[in-house]
Structures are given as structure tokens and as C-alpha cells.
Amino acid sequence: LKHIRERIQDEGMYYVLLDEIQLVPNFHEVLNSLLHVRNADVYVTGSNSKFLSKDVVTEFRGRGDEIHLHPLSFSEFMQGYQGDKWNGWREYYTFGGLPFILSLETEQKKSEYLKNLYESVYLVDILERNKVRNKAEFDELARIIASSIGSPCNPTKLSNTFKSVKNVTVSSASIARYLSYMEYAFLIEKSVRYNIKGKKYINTLSKYYFSDLGIRNALLGFRQQEESHIMENIIYNELRIRGYHVDVGMVEERTTDRNNKTIRKQYEVDFVANQGNRRYYIQSAFAMPDEAKTRQETASLTRIDDSFKKIIVVKDDIMPKRDENGIVTIGIMDFLLQPDSMDY
């Protein structure tokens, strides 16, 4: 603080940038002191939301703004990538959108950078900050989440996975804590299930997506690169970058069988994207090669009885089209590269 004050020598505006402020003991006091310097514009950065978003926003409510920086979107990535869009797509879904990746020339350098970033930054920060004693347990959970992106799960289900696959007992309470640590460190994001017709959240199962797919792939040694699951994660990230709150949708339908017994069936909508009074229902469908697959992907959308836009994103490089139910099908490239792609 003394160092900063000594350099503010006149009435001109000074810009103070403090990186990883959460590493400074009693950083609230430092920021409070700087708030009284009228000609200082202070920018604080950090890689752990628990010690920034929760503490700083609460402490300095009304006296500052929070900006959440994401890795590069695909369109931003392509502005720095030298090559065609499909080569860029393969590069992006393999090595992710951290800006430094664009400056590395070989696949080996990119993979080493991402592995080191996870091991020496993410993992160390999470373990030390939260005093996690069982590194192997936490690390294994991160890999399980990485290998099952887009799959509904909860702490109890993950605890059972540890028991059945790894023959290790990890309590659901411990897993819930570990997941929250990953979220606070911006490693993953949680998307909660939402009953569209019932207009309420369902807290039984959620989905987790990686903020950067390069980190996700590095966790798995660049194996398990199922393009369909990765595409779903990329669409989720794109929606978040565009400022949408994203839930996993569920449509419930009740019918009766020939014995007049009630049958309850659930249909999933990959994403319910909300922003103000706007809402979009979005399906990630890697391919729809035949009528059966098309019926499968549209089944949940046709059962939603409101007027919000319904979109299916496919990997095929197609012209956007709209069917008789008003459902728009659009290719992944148009969806990611056109800023108004959701308004077709």
C-alpha cells in the first residue's frame, strides 16, 4: 500500500492493477484504503471466485463492478488462428480457448502447457486454499467429471461411482465440497435441471461443464475426446459467454396405458438459456442422419407449449432451416461464428 501511495504524486488519474489479490493477507483493508484515493481507478484480478466474488462484492457492494472473464469463444479464437474454420474447430475442441495456446506452435507444447497449468495452478490453488488433505481423491473426482461432461449426476451418484469403479469410499458430503471448490476456481460450471412445464428447479441431478476444454482434455491425457459431448460443452460455454443463465430442461408428459394406469415420461432439453425476458430452448445434436434421429431430438421441443424459440445445433455445415413446428436447425459454425445466430 505504501508502494502505491508513493507513486500517486499529482491529481491525475492513476490506474492500479492488483493481480491475484486473494494471496495478500487482509486484502480487504488494502482495497478499502485505495477506495479513499479519489484519483485511483483500481482493478483487482484473481483466479478463485470464493475469495473474490463472495468477499469483494459483499464488502464493496455499490462501489465496484465484477467482470467474469471466460476463455476465448470460438469466434474470438478464430480471429487469432491461422487456418480454415474446420481445422480451427479441431484445434479448439482439443486444446481449448486459453489465449496463450495460440502462441504455441506444436501439439506437444500445447498439451504440456495445459497439463502444467492444471497441476501447478488449478490443483495447487484448490488444495492449498481449501486445505484438502486427500489430493488423490480430489484429483480422481476431477477426472471422473471430465470423463462424463454432460451426464446428469449428483454427489451421491458420484460416491457410488467411486465405490463401484475405484473400490474407494468417498462420502457424498466430501464430493459436494470438492465440486464447490472446482466451481469457485472456475474449473467447472454447474447447470441445474429445470422442469419447464412445472416451472421449478429439480435438485436431484445436475450437469457439469468445463470452463475450458483444453484443461478438461489435459486431465484425461487427451483421450476420450468424444466430439459430440465436447460440442455440447462448447455450446454451453458459448451461451455463458453471451451472457445467458443456462439450465438443463426437462419436460414431463403423463399418459395412460390400456389398463388406465398413469405412465410418466421425461424428455430432456439440453439447454434452457435465459437472459432478461428472452428464453431459448437448445438441443445439441451432433448429427441427425435419419428421420428416427430427428424425431428423437425434436421430441422434447415439440412438447413445450410456450412461444420461446427452439433451436437444434448440428455439426453439419448446413443452411439454417425452420420446420413446420417452428424449430430452427443450424450448423455449429453458423451458431458459433454469427453473433445473431439465435435470432434466425
Indicate where each model-derived feature is located.
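Short glycine-rich substrate-engagement loop in P-loop NTPases that contacts/grips substrate
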Residues: L1-Y15
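Structural recognition of the conserved hydrophobic beta-strand(s) that form the central parallel beta-sheet
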Residues: L17, D41-S47, H68
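Walker B catalytic acidic pair
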Residues: E20
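Conserved catalytic/switch belt of AAA+ P-loop NTPases
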Residues: H28-V44, T58
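Conserved nucleotide-binding/hydrolysis micro-motifs of P-loop NTPases
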Residues: N48-L52, L72-S75, Q108, D317-I318
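Interdomain hinge/linker elements that couple catalytic modules in large macromolecular machines
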Residues: S75-E252
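A cross-kingdom feature that marks ATP-driven nucleic-acid transaction machinery
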Residues: S174-Y344
